[in-house]
Amino acid sequence: MSKKAKAIKKTNAMRLLDQVGANYTTHDYESTGAISGVEVAAALGQDPSMTFKTLVAEGAGRQSKGGGAERTKEHYVFVVPVAAELDLKKAAAAVGEKSIAMIRQKELLPLTGYEHGGCSPLGMKKQFRTIIDSSAADKETIMFSGGKIGLQIETAPAELAKALEFEYGEIV
């Protein structure tokens, strides 16, 4: 299944891909502390447009049938290119919310099981509705966090779909 140069301790994300027989490659890099996704892509010699970051947001209000907004507190996962910023209005529209807000960094680990800088869309404590930026749809492969700082997973979007239910959306 996976192709790797040296033995890497399996993360939940890797286990999920293995369970469904998805093909993927792992890439590891030396962690230098707080490192941006663009820096990770550069460290691995990858194009930043094929390298994606995982962001978690909370719904702040959904349109009710009567026209008002109701508070939802639903959590959503958005996967966007590392060189791009999530457009909160587009992201809210993609999930049917009036608005969304990014969760606080201190909420990430208890909510997802992943730390900041190592958050993967795969293998979270609970599966949240996931929207991947539509720019990923035409890529041969995409790369995203493998579930810990210093580890990236590269796979085809079709392979990712074997392990993760997601939708594409215009979110940047």
Protein language model regions, located:
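Extended, low-hydrophobicity, polar/charged segments
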Residues: 1-172
